[in-house]
Amino acid sequence: MNKNYDVISVGGGPAGIFAALELAGQNLSILLIEKGKDIDERRCPMREAGRLCASCSPCSITCGLGGAGAFSDGKLTLSSKVGGHLDEYLGEAETEALVKYVDGIYVKYGAPERVYGTGEKVDEIKYKASLNELRLIPVPIRHMGTENCCQVLTRMRDELKSHIDLKLETAVEEVLIGNGAAKGVRTKSGEEYGCYWLVSLSRHGKVWFMLVVWVLA
């Protein structure tokens, strides 16, 4: 075993980054593993050279620290009405509280203060829609922009570097199991890391991880 941790988090997208930020203040030893490149090293040959997709593995657009949305225009929809069904599990009030909490973290790391989709103009459009038997569901949006989105994620990464271990360009090949529980991971290069808690937050690896859960069940 190369090293033991309290927590190993697999996947360096938004979920992995936010999980690490939350746990970093809990006096735990944490390892975050991401198979893609660091956010400022992610390059796409197709975008930079104007050529056809080179089928890079892993793809630097969809993989890497910051996740698939790192190079998006950074729109944060601040409502439980869109983006999933979390409110069905937690209730609307708790979901809205979590949305507000996460939004506050984005602002802390540099997201702009301005929020679109609120105010008198929206109320006016909503009223006009009702006159035509239509229902407008206003959704507040914080627009970071592509460049600022990357900067926000970079600041989060820099914060994490002082609290946790980051292993980038490292693919997890196997979950180590003992006594019916996950005990750690083995990387594609053969390194083994033990842990008490294993968190998998990877979109790309969800099918693989579901198979692991099925084996444990």
Tell where the protein language model's regions lie, with residue ranges:
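Residues forming the flavin
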Residues: M1-G83, E120-D123, Y127-A217
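Dinucleotide-binding Rossmann-like beta1-alpha1 core, especially the glycine-rich loop
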Residues: G64-V115
